[in-house]
Amino acid sequence: MTKKIHINAFEMNCVGHIAHGLWRHPENQRHRYTDLNYWTELAQLLEKGKFDALFLADVVGIYDVYRQSRDTAVREAVQIPVNDPLMLISAMAYVTKHLAFAVTFSTTYEHPYGHARRMSTLDHLTKGRIAWNVVTSHLPSADKNFGIKKILEHDERYDLADEYLEVCYKLWEGSWEDNAVIRDIENNIYTDPSKVHEINHSGKYFEVPGPHLCEPSPQRTPVIYQAGMSERGREFAAKHAECVFLGGKDVETLKFFVDDIRKRAKKYGRNPDHIKMFAGICVIVGKTHDEAMEKLNSFQKYWSLEGHLAHYGGGTGYDLSKYSSNDYIGSISVGEIINNMSKLDGKWFKLSVGTPKKVADEMQYLVEEAGIDGFNLVQYVSPGTFVDFIELVVPELQKRGLYRVDYEEGTYREKLFGKGNYRLPDDHIAARYRNISSNV
């Protein structure tokens, strides 16, 4: 195996992201999430560890399915309170040079015209280190609070997202020509008006004449992430995504998703290798196996079953408080689900516990056997999870030639796909909008 493994830190601008209850752990600093220094320190730590990116999750609603109430989520800080992730990026970019930032933003609630400007602005300010994790959202409470009168079904949300990205692509890729900005001081011409174009988009969901408000940024289009593993989500990923955050924690599940999405990508004329696949991973590492187990046991003491049941309810729509332990949801009994939720076992992602060698072995195995390209690293305590990984696992991966020793120059897209590849490839669907002046 010669390819380098890509590593992102999986974070959220809140107290309780995934490991619910652990905000109480004495080594956890997640209560500092409202302190900008917390985020700049974290960004510098991740860059020290040669991480590819900080992947920022987000929700714009409350988990209120469990017990038909928001109280459990609010009481236990299950992704609430939660602040806007976009506001963090400029400060973190200022104190780093190479670390990229993948930010989650929903296509369901806000207009693409304004969003396109925000992403272009961040791409300028980060010098091409921005990515967008495209989500369609799923929480009914978000629909209510954004005043959505006609609730879109799951697949129609992806129809809207398709058009949303089409609008953004037109603005980013085609509205301004590469040489539109000339900065001619003598003739008082900053931008050549003939090289700035309307997009004249008219669709089912959006009417956007254009032009884009921003001059071309280093990447133009941010690196596109996607994380939905439904049938429709995988189709969307095959069409749009450059990076996919996969569900699953075993080789069989991950390999199925990898092969399926890459096969679908060929239908759109895309090179399947132009899509990087990321799996979630939870790592508890120690210099010895016993030390790692001590950490796991320490985390388990603060693990909250109620918090995870609230999260499960919001994510699946099932209120387990209504069921007996002998009832079944699909092929799994409710008792089994609750038992699984009570244990710190990775839940949705692979859990790796042990020495640096054991963790590196398991990561390498998943990359080689499932065909993935990297991982989103979940944290249990902040910044301890990342510190341990950087100090113990990174040197082991570097020793095997599986992880960068230093960064290469360039944008985030170039760091993923090679020097010179700062724009979307020609086989991406967005490329058709580059000569928009001759297409509209």
UniProtKB/Swiss-Prot annotation:
Result, substituting residue 146 to Q: 2.3-fold increase in activity toward hexadecane
Keywords: Flavoprotein, FMN, Monooxygenase, Nucleotide-binding, Oxidoreductase, Plasmid, Secreted
Taxonomy, superkingdom: Bacteria
Noted pH dependence of activity: Optimum pH is 7.5.
A family per Pfam: Bac_luciferase
Biotechnology: Shows particular potential to be used for the treatment of environmental oil pollutions and in other biocatalytic processes. Random- and site-directed mutagenesis were used to generate mutants with increased activity toward hexadecane.
Catalytic activities: a long-chain alkane + FMNH2 + O2 = a long chain fatty alcohol + FMN + H2O + H(+)
Enzyme class, first EC level, given as a word: oxidoreductase
Effect noted on mutating residue 320 to A: 2.2-fold increase in activity toward hexadecane. Uses a narrower spectrum of n-alkanes
Record-stated family: Belongs to the NtaA/SnaA/DszA monooxygenase family.
The protein, known as: Long-chain alkane monooxygenase
Organism of this sequence: Geobacillus thermodenitrificans (strain NG80-2)
Gene name per UniProt: ladA
